[in-house]
């Protein structure tokens, strides 16, 4: 939905590629009641049932959903800083997902797509969300992704919705989601979905 109209509930200071994932993850785990729809803004409609296995408001992690270090979950992790409200793209990839494949035929809706651009010194990792068949304007395709372009001091960036088939021909080869591209790390699934 952020592609069509950014929710006022999405903090403008966190609008980047990983911020889109964090926002979507949190909001997916909330109860989608009348108060939620009012908070999200006009135009939001139900598109999936609530996640019954986890309730953000009552869960042990609260808003601190993102693991920040290696290791299997232990009870003391809830108190020792192993979980945070923030995760950049690298942290999402390293501690919160499992590798699926570089083959797009293995991807499922909700999987994350990671790129690594080592020449970008501050944030070399970039993440996109694979949505598969889009709810609106799918054009009969099932290879849609959404992502935030990132912001700069002069540009707040934007959320884009594009097909993998279009990205396959991106003018900069480093952004092509092809198995032959070493900058394309592949598809990853959130550990919470495993």
Which residues are covered by each model-predicted region?
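Bacterial peptidoglycan biogenesis and beta-lactam-recognition machinery
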Residues: 30-34, 136-139
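Sec-exported extracytoplasmic/periplasmic mature domains
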Residues: 5, 22-33, 115-118
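Low-complexity, Gly/Ser/Thr/Pro-rich intrinsically disordered linker/tail segments
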Residues: 140-194
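...with weaker cross-activation on analogous glycine-rich loops/strands in unrelated enzymes
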Residues: 44-154
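Second-shell loop/turn segments in exported
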Residues: 3-14, 99-101, 116-118
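Active-site nucleophilic cysteine motif
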Residues: 10-28
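Short acidic alpha-helical/loop segments enriched in Asp/Glu that coordinate divalent cations
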Residues: 33-42
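Secretory/export targeting leaders with adjacent low-complexity proregions
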Residues: 16-17, 22, 43, 47-50
């Amino acid at each position: 939905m952020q592609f069509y109209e950014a929710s006022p509930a999405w903090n403008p200071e966190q609008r980047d590629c990983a911020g889109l994932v964090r926002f979507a993850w949190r909001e997916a785990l909330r109860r989608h009641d009348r108060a939620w729809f009012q908070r999200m803004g006009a135009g939001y409609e139900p598109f999936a049932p609530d996640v019954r296995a986890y309730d953000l408001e009552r869960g042990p992690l609260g808003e601190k959903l993102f693991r920040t270090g290696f290791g299997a979950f232990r009870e003391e992790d809830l108190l020792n800083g192993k979980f945070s409200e923030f995760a950049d793209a690298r942290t999402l990839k390293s501690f919160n997902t499992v590798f699926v494949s570089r083959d797009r035929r293995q991807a499922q809706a909700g999987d994350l797509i990671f790129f690594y651009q080592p020449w970008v010194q501050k944030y070399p990792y970039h993440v996109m969300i694979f949505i598969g068949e889009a709810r609106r304007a799918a054009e009969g395709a099932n290879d849609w992704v959404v992502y935030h372009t990132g912001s700069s001091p002069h540009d707040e960036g934007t959320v884009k919705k594009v097909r993998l088939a279009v990205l396959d021909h991106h003018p900069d080869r480093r952004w092509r989601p092809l198995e032959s591209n070493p900058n394309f790390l592949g598809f990853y699934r959130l550990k919470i979905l495993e």
